[in-house]
Amino acid sequence: MNYTSVNKIRLWVLIVFLILYNIKCICENISDLKKRLCFNNFSNSKKKIKKKWLAKKKKNYLTIWKNKTYTTKRRNGYGKIEYKREENKKDDYNFMNTSLYLNYISNVKNFLFNKNNNKKNKIYYHKCKKSNIIEAKINDNDTLLSDEEFRNDVDRNDKEYYNIKKEYSENVCNQNRINDLSNCSVSSNNNILNECSSEVKKEMNYPLHNELYDNLNDNTIGHLKSEKCKEKYIRNFCILAHIDSGKSTLADRFLELTNTIKKKRMQEQFLDMMCLEREKGITIKLKAVRMHYNNYVFNLIDTPGHFDFYHEVKRSLNVCEGAILLIDGGKGIQSQTLNIFFELKKHDIKIIPVINKIDLSTCLYDKIKDDLINKFNFKENEILKISAKYGKNVKMLFQRIISDIPPPINTINSFFRGVVFDSFFDQYKGVVLIIKVLNGELRKKTEIFFINSAKSYIIQEVGYLVPEMKPTDVISQGDIAYVCSNIRNCDDIQISETIVNKDIIKKNNHNEFVINFKKINLGRDKNIMQRLSDEGKQYLTHHNKGEIKGDENGQVKCDENGQVKCDENGQVKCDENGQVKCDENGQVKCDENGQVKCDENGQVKCDENGQVKCDENGQVKCDENGQVKCDENGQVKCDENGQVKCDENGQVKCDKNKGEIKSFQYNEVKVDERYERNKEEIIYDHEHKKEGIFNIHKNDDLIKENIKEKENFSCSIQGNDNAIPILKKTDINIKSIAANKIEASYPSVYCNIYCVNDKKSNELEMSLNKLKLNDSSFSFKKYICETLGKGFKCGFNGLLHLNIIQERIKREYNIDTIVTAPSVNYLIRVKEKYMDKRLKEKLLEKNFDIQNMHIEQMDKTSSDDCFFFMTSNVNDIPTKNVVHSIYEPYVKTNIITPEIYQKYIMNECFKRRGIFIKKEIMNDQIIFLFEMPLSEILINFLDQIKSSTKGYGSMSYENIIIYKPSELYKIHIYINKKKIDSLSFLAHKRNYEDKSRKLVSKLKTLINPHQFLIIIQAALESKIFVSEKIKPLKKNVTAKCYGGDITRRRKLIEKQNEGKKKMFEIGKVKLPPNIFTKLFDIKSE
C-alpha cells in the first residue's frame, strides 16, 4: 500500500467522523429547540422548527473547525434578547437556575389556562427515578393527575408532551440551588423544608404568585440545600483493623468507586503517601479524605493497624460517628481486633463488621462469622463479606454506611466551634490543622481563638482533603477539613485544641476570657441564662442528641411504676436540640412518690455531659406536689442525707428583697472546697448590677469589705444555717465550651537521640518539633550526656515507632543521628535518711505523686522516711544502700495463636517472666492473657511469637501500666576503664549475667580494632564479672631487620609497646553511630 492510498483512507475516516458529529449536533439542536419554544410562548410552528435547527446545524458545522470564543444571541426566560460571550459552546439549557425554572412554570400556567386560547394544551409532570428528568403534568383543572390518568393522556396527546431535562450538579447544590425531587424523601421535617424554601424565595429574581409558590413548596421544590439539610448527607467514619487486613486496599476501592481519584493517577495503597509506608507495607499516619457518593459526602479516615500507632485510632474515633471493623478472612480475629472492639464500645459509636478477602481459597468466612456472633454479639444480618482487592460487595457496604451510620449531630448554636485532631507542617502555609467542625461555619479572613493556648489567628485558607488540599470558601458543621493560619510556632498547637470565633470572646474585669452573649445567635433558645449551669456546659459545650418533648404542659410523664425507661445504655435520648421541655414554672413533675428512678450509676443522662445526679439511693426526693425548685444556677444543693429541706410549702425561698444579703457572719457559713481551690477570693462583676458572684474564702476583711454593696449580690438559697450562698456567675469562662479532650497517649519506651554532627543540633531540635506536631504521641526534652554531648530524651510508643522517627529524621531533614538503648520508666522508692545533701537536692526535684498510680504489693510500713521518683535513665538511680525498692512496669498482653502452638507461646512468656492470668478458646484458636514486663516485650517478643506460630500468632498490649516490685540490678559497661552511661541498663536477678555476657560479646564484634588495646567490662555496682579484649592493630616494625643481633629486634618491639601504652591512656575509642540499634536488636535499614 503506497503513501497516497493511506492518506485517502485517513481522509475518508475523517469525513465519517464529521458526518457523525453533525448528526449529534442536529439531535441536540432539536431538543434545544423544544426548550426554546417552551420559553417563547410555546410556538409549535414546524416551519420555524426547520429554519432554526437548519441554521443551528450550519452554525455548528462551521464552528467545529475552531475552538475560539464567540458571541451568541438568544432570548432569556423573560423574552428579552441578550448577548452572551462563551467558550466551548455547550447546551445552554442543561441546567436551569431557580428563577428561570419557576418562571417557566408560571409561564406554563398562564399559557395553559388563558381563556383566549381555544386550544387546550397539557403539560405533564412526572418524576423519573432512573434518569434525572422532570416532566410536568397538569390537567385542565390545575391539579396533578394520577399515574393511570397520566398514562392515558400520554397516549392521546403525544405531540403535546414536553420534557425538561435538569441535570443534578453537586456544585450547584452547594450554592443552595434546587435539587432533584427524588431527594425530597430524605427530609421529614416540614419546618426545615419551609426554612429552606424561604431561602430559595429570597434568592429568586422574578416575583412569584403566592398560590404558585405554595404549590411548588409541596410538590416541586423537594429537598432544598441549607445547612440543616446538608448535615444529613454527611457520614464520618473510619476503617479499623489489625495490621495487614486490607484497610488501605479497601480505601483504594472507595476512592475508585466514588471517582475521587482518576484512573490515570490511581495506584495501590494510594493513601499511604510516605515512602516509609510503602517500603514497610504498613500505615503509619491516619489519612482523612472527602468523597462523594449519590449526593452523600463520605469523610473517610484510614488508620494504622500496628499497636505502636494505636493513638492514631483513638484520635479518629473522637471525630467519627461510625466505624468499619475489618477482619482478615484468611487469619480470622486477631489480638488488635479485640482491642479495637473494646475501644469502640467505650466511644459508643456504630460498628459495621466486615469480613475481607473472601476471594481467597483459604477464607474462613463461616468460622469468623460464628466468632463475631458469639464473641462480639453481632447479628448475622449485620455482618458483610467483601473482597477489597476486586471490589466485590463494596457498593453494598456503601449502602450500609448510609443507612447505619448516623449523620453528625445537629446543634442550634450558630457560632463556630471546631476540634483539632491532627496537624502537620507545610513549608509555605505553616502549621496546617485538620479539624472537625462541631457547629457553625468558618470562612476565610475570619479571626479564630484557641481556647487552651488563649491565642488568636486569622484564617488564611480553609478547604477539604480530597486527598490533596482543595481550598474552598466556607466549611460548615459536620465537615472534616483543614485550616491554614500561617502559624510558624509549633508549640502553639495542641491536639484536641478547641477553636472558636474571636467575636464571641471578651475579657472581663478580672482579665479572664469569657463568652460574649451579645455576639452569639441563640436560635430558638432565648432563655440561655436559665439553662446554663455555673460552668455553662449544659447548653454550650457539646453537640446534643435532641429534645424530649413533653405533653401540652411541657411535662414528661412517668409510667405506672414512676419510672422513666431508658435504653440499653441507661440513657434517655433527646431530639436534635438536646432539650427537655418543662412547663412555665420550669419544673418536671414526678410520680406520686415524688421520685425519679435512675440507672445503676444514679444518673439520668441526656447528652454527653447533661447529667442529673442523685443521692446514694439513686432518687431525687420532691415535695408534696412532686416538684423540685432550683436556684438561679439550675442546681439543688442537698444535705448529708442527699435531700433538700423545704419549708411548709415545699419550696426553698429567699427573702422578700429578691435574695439580698442583709447580714453576714463568717462563722455561720461552711467553706465549699470547690471555691477554696480557686485562687480568686472574691469575684465582683461591675457590668451586671443585678447579678454577681462571690466565693467564700478565709479572708474575713475581704468578705466584710465587699459584702457591704448588697445590691450587687443575690441569694440562691437562704434560711438554713448550713447553706452556702452561691450566686450564678454571669460571665461564663470560655473554657467551659471546650470540646472533650482526646485521651493523651503516654510513651512507653524512652531513649536518647544525639546528632552525629554537633553543628546540626539546632536543626535536629527544629525537626523534632515538626515531627511532634504531626505525631502527638511523640515527646522529647533536652538532655546532655558527658560522652555523646547535647541531645534529646525522647518518648515513643514502641520500638517500631522509634525506628520510624529515626528514619523520618534522616530522610525528611537529612540529619544523621545516634540512638541510645531503649528503656522504660521505673518507679524508685528511696530511703531519705541514707541520702547525703547533694543527692537529696537532686532527687527532690523528681519527687513523684503515686496516688493515681496502680502499684501492687506495696509495703505497709510507714513511708514518712521514703519518697518516690520515676526515671527511665539508669544513671539517675542511686546506690543500693539508698534504694528501698524498684518497681517495674507490667502491662496486660493479649496473645492469639492456633491451638497447636500454645506450648511454644507459654514457654516464651514464662521465659520472659510473664504472669499467666487466663485463656479463652475460640474455635481452634486460643486467646492468652498475660501480665508481662514492659521491658521484656519490647525487644523481639513479637518476632519470636511470629516465628513460633509460623506467622499465625499476634500480640497486642494495653496502655494501662501496673507497677510491681522486682529484684533488678543496675549493670554498668566500662570501655578502657571508663564508664559509658548510655550503655548502662537494668536487668533482673534471674538473667542479668546472661544478658551482660551477650552484650559484651556483641560490643566486641561491633567496635573496630584500634591501635591500642580495648578492654570491655560489665560490672554490678563495683564488681566486674564479665570482661572481653579487642587486640590492637600492629605494625611489623622488625620487617626491616634482615639479620644481626636479636637485641635490635627487642628494642623495636619494646618501643612499639611503650607507644601502645601511652595511646591506651590518652586514646579515645570511637563507637560506630548505629552501634546502639544493632546492639539491642532494633532493625535499621
From Swiss-Prot:
Top-rank taxon: Eukaryota
Cystine pairs: none
Keyword hit for Protein biosynthesis: yes
A GO BP annotation: translation
Molecular-function annotations in GO: GTP binding; GTPase activity; ribosome binding
InterPro entries reported in the protein's UniProt record: EF-4, EFG_III/V, EFG_V-like, LepA_C_sf, LepA_CTD, LepA_IV, P-loop_NTPase, Small_GTP-bd
Keywords: GTP-binding, Hydrolase, Membrane, Mitochondrion, Mitochondrion inner membrane, Nucleotide-binding, Protein biosynthesis, Transit peptide
Catalytic activity: GTP + H2O = GDP + phosphate + H(+)
Localization in the cell: Mitochondrion inner membrane
PROSITE patterns the UniProt entry points to: G_TR_2
Alphabetical list of Gene3D superfamilies matching this protein: 3.30.70.240, Elongation factor 4, C-terminal domain, Elongation Factor G (Translational Gtpase), domain 3, P-loop containing nucleotide triphosphate hydrolases, Translation factors
Predominant subcellular localization, coarse grouping: mitochondrion
Top EC group: hydrolase
Similarity remark: Belongs to the TRAFAC class translation factor GTPase superfamily. Classic translation factor GTPase family. LepA subfamily.
Known function: Promotes mitochondrial protein synthesis. May act as a fidelity factor of the translation reaction, by catalyzing a one-codon backward translocation of tRNAs on improperly translocated ribosomes. Binds to mitochondrial ribosomes in a GTP-dependent manner.
Annotated protein name in UniProt: Translation factor GUF1 homolog, mitochondrial
